[in-house]
Swiss-Prot record:
Keyword Cytoplasm: yes
Recorded superkingdom: Eukaryota
Tissue specificity as recorded in UniProt: Widely expressed.
Methyltransferase listed as a keyword: yes
Cellular location(s): Cytoplasm
GO cellular component, one term: protein-containing complex
Entry binding sites for S-adenosyl-L-methionine: W43, G75, S76, G77, D96, W126, A142, Y147
The name this protein goes by in its record: Protein N-lysine methyltransferase METTL21D
GO molecular function: ATPase binding; protein methyltransferase activity; protein-lysine N-methyltransferase activity
Transmembrane segments: none
One Pfam family matching this protein: Methyltransf_16
Length: 228
């Protein structure tokens, strides 16, 4: 399932490029760093979600479902998912911490010739104010359910960003080691307080880029209850 890895000639131990081929034969090139934390590499969930966005079941007939839609990616890291959306016609904001902005901007620059919508990078720390961000049509997130201490800030940001029509597409790898199962359980327990969600069946994922332990979930903010 893994996309190809293309080493950088200058220092392959320090940086390397992951190559992701699109259905139209063009190629996204994603710079990664061998050190610098979890945000500096392309995780499998990001590949699975990126390829899902290209599936006929998601894209629909005629213009792509993301064409001219506003998209915000949370925890973008390398920007893989957001860049895929931008090549499909979406107007995208990829977000992550300050220390990942240079990597995001580098990957935007490397792939700008493929973008048919628009894409820009912004700093966003989960749980903090989102003054300059509007509710998008779609929020995309891949492998963001990772650290227990980030769950509540992440959920606050999802609530703050979500409008009544916002569709959140969350892709995550189900991990069985250590505290991962209880972190995942806590996330969905907290999520259901304010959101409805449904899992997309595996047979709706990309035929090649799929795995039984990687899940795609659609999430929407609950409708307000009418006054009694």
């Amino acid at each position: 399932m893994a996309a190809a890895v293309e080493p950088e000639v200058e220092d392959p131990l320090w940086s390397f490029v992951r190559v992701l081929e699109k259905r139209d034969g063009t190629v996204l090139r994603l710079q990664q760093y061998g050190s610098g934390g979890v945000g500096c590499v392309v995780w499998d969930a990001a590949i699975v979600l990126s390829k899902y966005l290209e599936t006929p079941g998601f894209s629909g007939d005629g213009a792509h479902a993301l064409s001219r839609r506003s998209v915000l990616e949370l925890g973008s890291g390398t920007g893989a998912v957001g860049l895929m959306a931008a090549t499909l016609g979406a107007d995208v904001i990829v977000t992550d911490l300050e220390e990942l902005q240079d990597l995001l901007k580098m990957n935007i620059d490397m792939n700008k010739h493929l973008v048919t919508g628009s894409v820009q990078a912004k700093v966003l720390k989960w749980g903090e104010d989102i003054e300059d961000l509007m509710s998008p049509d779609y929020i995309l997130m891949a492998d963001c359910i990772y650290y227990e201490e980030s769950l509540e800030p992440l959920l606050k940001t999802l609530k703050d960003l979500s409008g009544s029509e916002t569709c959140i597409i969350c892709c995550y790898e189900q991990r069985t080691m250590g505290k991962n199962p209880e972190i995942e359980k806590k996330y969905f327990e907290l999520l259901q307080l304010d959101f409805d969600f449904e899992e997309i069946p595996l047979d709706k994922h990309d035929e090649e880029y799929r795995s039984e332990d990687i899940h795609i979930v659609y999430i929407r903010k609950k409708k307000p209850k009418p006054p009694s």
